[in-house]
């Protein structure tokens, strides 16, 4: 399979979606990743069904006070125009002007001051292959 530019491009010969392995598949509650309120941030796009599923589970488990949420703009944009054509979820600083107000999207990520989810992944794990994450 050729290197992918987004999770949507991970399709096998039969047209089925095949997710690549991720560096971010650890379990919260382990010694390395203790379950501590405020330690983690859930990033979501309300346009992404996978992300909306995580919001539903967070609510069903009553974790709203434990895991804060940051919402990104509901459309993809080029994440590093000077470097490559990768498109992914972005914050208001890089989004269409009307996207941020409708969904209370912050200008930048509150943790890393990043302007895209790709930049958040790269800040958390500098060696991450951005093509293999839904960014």
Regions found by a protein language model. Name each.
Residues 1-40:
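N-terminal regions that are enriched for targeting/export leaders
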Residues 14-15, 41-43, 104-111:
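N-terminal start-of-chain detector that recognizes signal peptides
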Residues 20-22, 48-49, 115:
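A short linear-motif detector with a strong N-terminal bias
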Residues 23, 30, 56, 95-97, ...:
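A generic structural signal for solvent-exposed, polar alpha-helical segments
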Residues 28-80, 86-90:
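Local sequence-structure signature of Cys/Sec-based thiol-disulfide redox active-site neighborhoods
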Residues 78-128:
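Thioredoxin-like thiol-disulfide oxidoreductase module
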Residues 132-135:
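A short, hydrophobic beta-strand/beta-hairpin element that forms part of a small beta-sheet core
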């Amino acid at each position: 399979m050729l290197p992918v530019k987004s999770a949507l491009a991970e399709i096998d010969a039969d047209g089925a979606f095949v997710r690549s392995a991720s560096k971010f598949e650890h379990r919260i509650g382990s010694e390395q990743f203790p379950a501590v309120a405020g330690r983690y941030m859930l990033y979501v796009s309300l346009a992404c069904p996978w992300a909306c599923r995580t919001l539903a589970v967070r609510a069903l488990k009553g974790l709203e006070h434990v895991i804060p949420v940051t919402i990104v703009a509901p459309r993809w944009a080029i994440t590093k125009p000077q470097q490559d054509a990768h498109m992914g979820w972005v914050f208001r600083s890089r989004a269409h002007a009307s996207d941020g107000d409708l969904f209370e999207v912050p200008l930048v990520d509150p943790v890393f001051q990043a302007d895209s989810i790709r930049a958040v992944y790269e800040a958390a794990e500098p060696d991450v292959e951005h093509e293999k994450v839904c960014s």
